[in-house]
From Swiss-Prot:
EC number(s) stated in the UniProt entry for this protein: 3.1.1.61, 3.5.1.44
Lineage of source species: Bacteria, Pseudomonadati, Pseudomonadota, Betaproteobacteria, Burkholderiales
GO MF annotation terms: phosphorelay response regulator activity; protein-glutamate methylesterase activity; protein-glutamine glutaminase activity
UniProt source species: Cupriavidus pinatubonensis (strain JMP 134 / LMG 1197)
Catalysed reactions listed for this entry: [protein]-L-glutamate 5-O-methyl ester + H2O = L-glutamyl-[protein] + methanol + H(+); L-glutaminyl-[protein] + H2O = L-glutamyl-[protein] + NH4(+)
Protein name as it appears in the record: Protein-glutamate methylesterase/protein-glutamine glutaminase 2
Domain remark from Swiss-Prot or TrEMBL: Contains a C-terminal catalytic domain, and an N-terminal region which modulates catalytic activity.
Length: 356
Protein backbone atom coordinates (compact mmCIF):
# COMPACT_ATOMS: atom_id res chain seq x y z
CA UNK A 1 0.00 0.00 0.00
CA UNK A 2 1.50 3.33 -1.05
CA UNK A 3 1.69 6.18 1.46
CA UNK A 4 -0.68 9.09 0.93
CA UNK A 5 0.81 11.97 -1.03
CA UNK A 6 1.60 15.26 0.70
CA UNK A 7 -1.23 17.65 -0.21
CA UNK A 8 0.03 21.14 -1.09
CA UNK A 9 -1.93 24.36 -1.60
CA UNK A 10 -0.01 27.11 -3.48
CA UNK A 11 -0.95 30.74 -2.78
CA UNK A 12 0.62 33.34 -5.10
CA UNK A 13 -0.73 36.30 -7.05
CA UNK A 14 1.49 35.35 -10.03
CA UNK A 15 -0.14 32.84 -12.39
CA UNK A 16 3.36 31.93 -13.64
CA UNK A 17 4.62 31.06 -10.14
CA UNK A 18 1.45 29.07 -9.39
CA UNK A 19 1.94 27.13 -12.63
CA UNK A 20 5.67 26.47 -12.01
CA UNK A 21 5.14 25.41 -8.40
CA UNK A 22 2.42 23.03 -9.58
CA UNK A 23 4.76 21.58 -12.23
CA UNK A 24 7.61 21.14 -9.72
CA UNK A 25 5.46 19.61 -6.97
CA UNK A 26 3.49 17.29 -9.25
CA UNK A 27 6.75 15.96 -10.74
CA UNK A 28 7.54 14.40 -7.34
CA UNK A 29 6.20 10.92 -6.57
CA UNK A 30 5.21 11.72 -2.97
CA UNK A 31 3.38 15.06 -3.24
CA UNK A 32 0.69 16.80 -5.25
CA UNK A 33 -0.86 20.25 -5.61
CA UNK A 34 -4.49 19.97 -4.53
CA UNK A 35 -5.26 23.61 -5.32
CA UNK A 36 -3.87 27.07 -6.13
CA UNK A 37 -5.12 30.47 -4.99
CA UNK A 38 -4.30 33.99 -6.27
CA UNK A 39 -4.71 35.63 -2.85
CA UNK A 40 -5.25 34.81 0.84
CA UNK A 41 -9.01 35.40 0.77
CA UNK A 42 -9.48 32.64 -1.83
CA UNK A 43 -6.91 30.51 0.02
CA UNK A 44 -8.87 30.76 3.27
CA UNK A 45 -11.87 29.00 1.70
CA UNK A 46 -9.68 26.42 -0.07
CA UNK A 47 -7.94 25.48 3.19
CA UNK A 48 -11.35 24.65 4.69
CA UNK A 49 -12.37 22.59 1.63
CA UNK A 50 -9.09 20.82 0.81
CA UNK A 51 -7.38 20.42 4.22
CA UNK A 52 -3.84 20.62 2.74
CA UNK A 53 -0.78 19.27 4.58
CA UNK A 54 1.47 22.17 3.51
CA UNK A 55 0.77 25.71 2.30
CA UNK A 56 3.21 27.63 0.07
CA UNK A 57 2.59 31.35 0.54
CA UNK A 58 3.88 34.38 -1.36
CA UNK A 59 4.99 37.04 1.12
CA UNK A 60 3.70 40.04 -0.88
CA UNK A 61 0.16 39.85 -2.30
CA UNK A 62 -2.89 42.02 -3.02
CA UNK A 63 -6.19 42.02 -1.07
CA UNK A 64 -4.58 40.75 2.12
CA UNK A 65 -0.92 41.02 3.10
CA UNK A 66 0.83 37.63 3.31
CA UNK A 67 2.03 38.40 6.86
CA UNK A 68 -1.44 39.37 8.09
CA UNK A 69 -2.82 36.15 6.63
CA UNK A 70 0.00 34.07 8.14
CA UNK A 71 -0.52 35.62 11.58
CA UNK A 72 -4.26 34.82 11.51
CA UNK A 73 -3.66 31.33 10.11
CA UNK A 74 -1.12 30.40 12.81
CA UNK A 75 -3.49 31.65 15.49
CA UNK A 76 -6.68 30.01 14.19
CA UNK A 77 -5.51 26.95 12.23
CA UNK A 78 -1.77 26.31 12.69
CA UNK A 79 -0.30 24.35 9.77
CA UNK A 80 3.07 24.00 8.02
CA UNK A 81 3.71 27.06 5.82
CA UNK A 82 6.58 27.47 3.34
CA UNK A 83 7.08 31.12 2.37
CA UNK A 84 7.97 32.05 -1.22
CA UNK A 85 10.02 35.25 -1.12
CA UNK A 86 11.62 37.67 -3.55
CA UNK A 87 15.39 38.18 -3.40
CA UNK A 88 15.12 41.79 -2.24
CA UNK A 89 15.96 43.61 0.98
CA UNK A 90 12.26 44.16 1.65
CA UNK A 91 11.54 40.52 0.80
CA UNK A 92 14.21 39.32 3.24
CA UNK A 93 12.88 41.50 6.08
CA UNK A 94 9.31 40.28 5.51
CA UNK A 95 10.55 36.68 5.40
CA UNK A 96 12.34 37.07 8.75
CA UNK A 97 9.07 38.31 10.23
CA UNK A 98 7.18 35.38 8.66
CA UNK A 99 9.56 32.91 10.33
CA UNK A 100 8.94 34.67 13.64
CA UNK A 101 5.20 34.25 13.10
CA UNK A 102 5.55 30.50 12.66
CA UNK A 103 6.37 29.76 9.01
CA UNK A 104 8.51 26.61 8.85
CA UNK A 105 10.90 27.76 6.10
CA UNK A 106 11.13 29.72 2.87
CA UNK A 107 12.28 29.47 -0.74
CA UNK A 108 13.34 32.39 -2.89
CA UNK A 109 12.14 33.41 -6.34
CA UNK A 110 15.04 34.09 -8.71
CA UNK A 111 15.34 37.74 -9.80
CA UNK A 112 15.74 36.90 -13.49
CA UNK A 113 14.60 33.96 -15.59
CA UNK A 114 11.97 32.87 -13.11
CA UNK A 115 11.08 29.72 -15.04
CA UNK A 116 14.64 28.38 -15.32
CA UNK A 117 15.53 29.56 -11.83
CA UNK A 118 12.58 27.91 -10.14
CA UNK A 119 13.03 24.68 -12.08
CA UNK A 120 16.66 24.57 -10.85
CA UNK A 121 15.26 24.78 -7.32
CA UNK A 122 13.15 21.64 -7.84
CA UNK A 123 15.07 19.46 -5.36
CA UNK A 124 15.27 22.24 -2.77
CA UNK A 125 11.55 23.03 -2.99
CA UNK A 126 10.61 19.34 -2.82
CA UNK A 127 12.92 18.72 0.16
CA UNK A 128 11.52 21.74 2.01
CA UNK A 129 7.93 20.64 1.40
CA UNK A 130 8.78 17.15 2.73
CA UNK A 131 10.40 18.68 5.81
CA UNK A 132 7.46 21.05 6.30
CA UNK A 133 4.96 18.19 6.13
CA UNK A 134 6.75 16.53 9.07
CA UNK A 135 7.54 19.73 10.95
CA UNK A 136 6.36 20.55 14.44
CA UNK A 137 4.35 23.72 13.89
CA UNK A 138 4.79 26.63 16.28
CA UNK A 139 1.75 28.78 16.96
CA UNK A 140 2.12 32.51 16.45
CA UNK A 141 3.56 34.11 19.59
CA UNK A 142 0.96 35.93 21.63
CA UNK A 143 1.29 39.66 22.05
CA UNK A 144 3.31 40.47 25.15
CA UNK A 145 0.93 40.59 28.09
CA UNK A 146 3.08 40.43 31.14
CA UNK A 147 5.24 37.70 29.63
CA UNK A 148 8.46 37.39 31.61
CA UNK A 149 11.55 38.85 30.00
CA UNK A 150 14.30 36.45 28.99
CA UNK A 151 16.34 35.92 32.15
CA UNK A 152 19.76 37.56 32.09
CA UNK A 153 22.47 34.95 32.40
CA UNK A 154 25.67 35.99 34.10
CA UNK A 155 28.93 35.08 32.50
CA UNK A 156 31.31 33.08 34.66
CA UNK A 157 34.88 34.33 34.76
CA UNK A 158 36.06 33.15 31.38
CA UNK A 159 39.09 33.15 29.22
CA UNK A 160 38.51 35.09 26.00
CA UNK A 161 39.68 31.95 24.22
CA UNK A 162 36.37 30.16 24.71
CA UNK A 163 34.09 29.85 21.66
CA UNK A 164 30.52 28.75 20.99
CA UNK A 165 30.16 27.17 17.53
CA UNK A 166 26.58 26.71 16.31
CA UNK A 167 24.81 25.20 13.30
CA UNK A 168 21.12 25.15 12.32
CA UNK A 169 18.77 24.91 9.34
CA UNK A 170 14.96 24.54 9.12
CA UNK A 171 13.42 26.28 12.12
CA UNK A 172 16.81 27.66 13.09
CA UNK A 173 16.11 31.38 12.82
CA UNK A 174 13.81 31.34 15.86
CA UNK A 175 15.90 28.73 17.71
CA UNK A 176 19.04 30.85 17.27
CA UNK A 177 17.17 33.90 18.56
CA UNK A 178 16.04 31.93 21.63
CA UNK A 179 19.62 30.77 22.20
CA UNK A 180 21.32 34.17 21.79
CA UNK A 181 18.89 36.41 23.71
CA UNK A 182 19.84 35.21 27.22
CA UNK A 183 23.60 35.50 26.58
CA UNK A 184 25.35 38.16 28.69
CA UNK A 185 27.21 41.04 26.98
CA UNK A 186 30.59 39.46 27.85
CA UNK A 187 29.67 36.04 26.45
CA UNK A 188 32.32 34.11 24.53
CA UNK A 189 32.20 34.71 20.79
CA UNK A 190 29.57 32.73 18.87
CA UNK A 191 30.12 31.60 15.26
CA UNK A 192 26.92 30.57 13.47
CA UNK A 193 25.98 28.81 10.26
CA UNK A 194 22.26 28.99 9.43
CA UNK A 195 21.33 27.71 5.96
CA UNK A 196 20.07 30.86 4.23
CA UNK A 197 20.60 32.63 0.88
CA UNK A 198 22.73 35.75 0.38
CA UNK A 199 20.97 38.91 1.50
CA UNK A 200 18.74 37.18 4.03
CA UNK A 201 21.55 36.67 6.55
CA UNK A 202 22.06 40.44 6.78
CA UNK A 203 18.39 41.01 7.68
CA UNK A 204 18.62 38.10 10.12
CA UNK A 205 21.72 39.54 11.83
CA UNK A 206 20.22 43.03 12.05
CA UNK A 207 17.01 41.71 13.57
CA UNK A 208 18.92 39.70 16.19
CA UNK A 209 21.26 42.58 16.95
CA UNK A 210 18.26 44.67 17.97
CA UNK A 211 17.06 41.95 20.36
CA UNK A 212 20.24 40.62 21.98
CA UNK A 213 22.65 41.94 24.60
CA UNK A 214 25.59 40.74 22.55
CA UNK A 215 26.41 42.31 19.17
CA UNK A 216 25.14 40.20 16.25
CA UNK A 217 26.57 40.76 12.76
CA UNK A 218 27.35 39.10 9.47
CA UNK A 219 30.88 37.73 9.57
CA UNK A 220 33.48 39.60 7.50
CA UNK A 221 36.54 37.96 6.02
CA UNK A 222 39.63 38.35 8.18
CA UNK A 223 37.95 40.12 11.10
CA UNK A 224 39.04 39.23 14.62
CA UNK A 225 36.62 37.04 16.57
CA UNK A 226 35.86 38.77 19.89
CA UNK A 227 33.86 38.03 23.06
CA UNK A 228 30.45 39.67 23.17
CA UNK A 229 29.86 39.12 19.44
CA UNK A 230 27.92 36.59 17.38
CA UNK A 231 29.11 36.17 13.78
CA UNK A 232 26.63 34.80 11.24
CA UNK A 233 27.96 33.21 8.04
CA UNK A 234 26.80 35.32 5.07
CA UNK A 235 24.52 33.49 2.65
CA UNK A 236 26.47 31.85 -0.19
CA UNK A 237 29.79 31.92 1.77
CA UNK A 238 31.43 29.24 3.88
CA UNK A 239 32.53 30.46 7.33
CA UNK A 240 35.59 28.98 9.00
CA UNK A 241 37.35 29.64 12.28
CA UNK A 242 41.00 30.48 11.64
CA UNK A 243 44.05 31.68 13.56
CA UNK A 244 46.12 34.82 13.06
CA UNK A 245 48.92 34.63 15.59
CA UNK A 246 47.31 34.42 19.02
CA UNK A 247 43.92 35.62 17.75
CA UNK A 248 40.93 33.85 16.29
CA UNK A 249 39.68 35.31 12.99
CA UNK A 250 36.74 34.65 10.66
CA UNK A 251 37.58 33.21 7.24
CA UNK A 252 35.05 33.36 4.39
CA UNK A 253 35.29 31.50 1.08
CA UNK A 254 33.28 30.71 -2.05
CA UNK A 255 34.43 27.10 -2.30
CA UNK A 256 32.01 24.48 -3.62
CA UNK A 257 28.91 23.71 -1.51
CA UNK A 258 29.30 20.92 1.06
CA UNK A 259 26.27 18.68 1.72
CA UNK A 260 24.57 20.86 -0.95
CA UNK A 261 25.00 23.90 1.30
CA UNK A 262 27.06 27.08 1.26
CA UNK A 263 27.44 28.02 4.06
CA UNK A 264 27.83 24.50 5.43
CA UNK A 265 27.76 23.58 9.11
CA UNK A 266 30.35 20.83 8.54
CA UNK A 267 32.82 23.37 7.12
CA UNK A 268 32.51 25.56 10.25
CA UNK A 269 32.63 22.58 12.64
CA UNK A 270 35.71 21.08 10.91
CA UNK A 271 37.56 24.39 11.25
CA UNK A 272 36.56 24.64 14.92
CA UNK A 273 37.92 21.13 15.50
CA UNK A 274 41.21 22.14 13.87
CA UNK A 275 41.72 25.55 15.48
CA UNK A 276 39.50 25.62 18.58
CA UNK A 277 39.86 22.15 20.09
CA UNK A 278 39.08 22.11 23.81
CA UNK A 279 38.10 25.78 23.80
CA UNK A 280 34.92 25.01 21.83
CA UNK A 281 31.36 24.36 22.92
CA UNK A 282 29.48 22.97 19.90
CA UNK A 283 25.72 23.40 19.49
CA UNK A 284 23.49 21.88 16.81
CA UNK A 285 19.89 23.05 16.57
CA UNK A 286 16.77 22.17 14.57
CA UNK A 287 17.30 21.45 10.87
CA UNK A 288 16.70 19.15 7.93
CA UNK A 289 19.37 16.77 6.68
CA UNK A 290 22.73 15.74 8.11
CA UNK A 291 24.96 18.80 7.65
CA UNK A 292 27.09 19.13 10.79
CA UNK A 293 26.98 15.49 11.93
CA UNK A 294 30.50 14.57 10.77
CA UNK A 295 31.93 17.93 11.84
CA UNK A 296 30.44 17.64 15.32
CA UNK A 297 32.11 14.25 15.76
CA UNK A 298 35.43 15.78 14.67
CA UNK A 299 34.94 18.59 17.21
CA UNK A 300 34.31 16.01 19.95
CA UNK A 301 37.43 14.08 18.95
CA UNK A 302 39.40 17.36 19.15
CA UNK A 303 38.19 17.97 22.72
CA UNK A 304 35.07 20.11 22.24
CA UNK A 305 31.96 19.63 24.38
CA UNK A 306 28.84 19.32 22.21
CA UNK A 307 25.11 19.77 22.77
CA UNK A 308 22.17 18.96 20.48
CA UNK A 309 18.61 20.25 20.62
CA UNK A 310 16.11 17.57 21.68
CA UNK A 311 13.38 16.21 19.42
CA UNK A 312 10.47 17.66 21.42
CA UNK A 313 11.59 21.27 20.81
CA UNK A 314 12.88 20.92 17.22
CA UNK A 315 10.83 22.09 14.24
CA UNK A 316 12.67 19.36 12.27
CA UNK A 317 14.74 16.78 14.19
CA UNK A 318 17.09 16.00 11.30
CA UNK A 319 20.50 17.55 11.94
CA UNK A 320 20.51 16.94 15.72
CA UNK A 321 19.36 13.34 15.20
CA UNK A 322 22.17 12.68 12.69
CA UNK A 323 24.78 14.30 14.96
CA UNK A 324 23.61 12.15 17.90
CA UNK A 325 23.69 9.00 15.72
CA UNK A 326 27.23 9.84 14.54
CA UNK A 327 28.43 9.94 18.15
CA UNK A 328 29.45 13.60 18.30
CA UNK A 329 27.02 14.76 21.00
CA UNK A 330 27.60 14.79 24.78
CA UNK A 331 24.20 16.18 25.85
CA UNK A 332 20.72 16.38 24.33
CA UNK A 333 18.92 19.44 25.69
CA UNK A 334 15.55 21.18 25.15
CA UNK A 335 15.91 24.55 23.44
CA UNK A 336 14.67 26.53 26.46
CA UNK A 337 17.53 25.10 28.58
CA UNK A 338 20.28 25.24 25.94
CA UNK A 339 21.84 28.62 26.75
CA UNK A 340 21.87 27.87 30.47
CA UNK A 341 23.55 24.49 29.89
CA UNK A 342 26.19 26.06 27.65
CA UNK A 343 26.99 28.76 30.22
CA UNK A 344 27.07 26.19 33.03
CA UNK A 345 29.50 24.08 31.02
CA UNK A 346 31.69 27.11 30.33
CA UNK A 347 31.77 27.83 34.08
CA UNK A 348 33.43 24.44 34.68
CA UNK A 349 36.38 25.50 32.52
CA UNK A 350 37.55 28.08 35.04
CA UNK A 351 39.54 31.18 34.20
CA UNK A 352 42.74 29.78 32.72
CA UNK A 353 43.17 30.34 29.00
CA UNK A 354 43.64 27.17 27.01
CA UNK A 355 45.89 27.79 24.04
CA UNK A 356 45.77 25.34 21.19
Amino acid sequence: MTAAKIKVLCVDDSALIRSLMTEIINSQPDMEVVGTAPDPLVAREMIKQLNPDVLTLDVEMPRMDGLDFLERLMRLRPMPVLMVSSLTERGSEITMRALELGAVDFVTKPKLGIRDGLMEYTDTIADKIRAASRARVRQAPQAASGTPATPMLRSPLLSTEKLIILGASTGGTEAIKDFLMPLPPDSPAVLIVQHMPAGFTRSFAQRLDGLCRITVKEAEHGERVLPGYAYIAPGDSHLRLARSGANYVAHLSQEAPVNRHRPSVDVLFDSAAEHGGKNVIGVILTGMGKDGAKGMLRMREAGAYNLAQDESTCIVFGMPKEAIAAGGVHEVVPLHSMTQRVMARLATYGTRAQRV
